């Protein structure tokens, strides 16, 4: 595969059933509705910062379990109780992760205090065995509490999100945090509708391997496109700054040019991949700067 350490487990899956579920709508009145869903399904919420279909790798992420979502009055809601599906290389052999689980709930509504804004609050729980961190591997029990402010205003668009994580990792208290933002302004009256954008993200890293805490942020099932379409780095012990310019030279073409700079949040913690594996330990270098990436995308 050309990858150091060989192919990832997610790189091969001959034939798989990504989605197979039953759905029921027990309530519908005007715009209000409730949907219940059970079975194997893909899940993706918000900007995929914590839960996504793993777009960018060779196989997609599915989940087995229950989901309820809908709208009641001015409130939208989503709840899930599922087990992640492990990717295996054969035909129809993917299975629910042993000892793993994921559950979460979120509500969102329009926010009159923000320009064309909306607010989402959420909480989730994740249990996973054999999770790799710079301090070692073990069972990770983690609760995430977050809030997101977002808008799809034709001129000013923004997505700002942040939160904390608490839990336990092999007797260590988990105390992690994260912040993510993507802000842009589109000059709708100009030729090509140019958009200037700026993304700034920061995720905590472990400060001291001997203080009885684990401070490394766990991005759970985040989109692998965090570090661009190549998906080489993940949002753990990292911060980045990414300016961009988008424009349409013709009606059916959108061009985006950008640059991304990556740094370690803590020089005492390692560098993590988009799937959460440890790519470099924190003891081999004290440098914070990881590297830069330049991107060009035509859609």
PLM-predicted stretches and their roles:
Residues 236-278:
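Exposed, low-structure sequence patches enriched in small/polar residues
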Residues 28-36, 50, 54-213, 248, ...:
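Signature for the C-terminal beta-barrel architecture of outer-membrane proteins
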Residues 15-19, 193-194, 217:
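A broad structural signal for short, well-ordered beta-strand segments within beta-sheet-rich domains
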Residues 2-63:
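Well-ordered mid-protein domain cores that form the structural environment of catalytic cofactors
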């Amino acid at each position: 595969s050309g990858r150091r350490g060989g192919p990832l487990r997610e790189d091969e899956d001959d034939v798989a059933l990504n989605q197979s579920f039953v759905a029921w709508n027990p309530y519908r009145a005007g715009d209000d509705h409730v949907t219940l869903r059970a079975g194997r399904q893909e899940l993706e919420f918000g900007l995929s910062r914590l839960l996504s279909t793993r777009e960018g790798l060779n196989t997609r992420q599915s989940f087995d379990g229950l989901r309820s979502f809908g709208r009641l009055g001015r409130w939208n809601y989503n709840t899930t109780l599922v087990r992640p599906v492990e990717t295996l290389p054969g035909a129809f052999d993917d299975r629910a992760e042993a000892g793993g689980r994921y559950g979460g709930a979120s509500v969102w509504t329009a926010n009159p205090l923000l320009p064309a804004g909306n607010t989402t609050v959420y909480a989730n729980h994740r249990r996973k065995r054999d999770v790799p961190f710079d301090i070692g591997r073990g069972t990770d029990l983690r609760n995430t509490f977050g809030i997101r402010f977002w808008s799809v205003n034709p001129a000013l668009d923004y997505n700002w999100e942040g939160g904390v994580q608490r839990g336990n990792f092999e007797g260590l208290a988990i105390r992690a945090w994260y912040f993510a933002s993507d802000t842009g302004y589109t000059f709708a009256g100009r030729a090509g509708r140019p958009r200037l954008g700026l993304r700034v993200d920061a995720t905590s890293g472990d400060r001291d391997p001997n203080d009885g805490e684990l401070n490394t942020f766990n991005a759970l099932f985040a989109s692998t496109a965090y570090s661009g379409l190549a998906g080489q780095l993940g949002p753990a012990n990292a911060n980045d700054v990414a300016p961009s310019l988008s424009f349409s030279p013709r009606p059916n073409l959108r061009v985006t040019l950008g640059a991304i700079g990556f740094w370690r949040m803590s020089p005492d913690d390692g560098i993590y991949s988009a799937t959460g594996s440890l790519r470099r330990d924190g003891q081999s270098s004290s440098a914070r700067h990881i590297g830069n990436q330049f991107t060009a995308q035509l859609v």
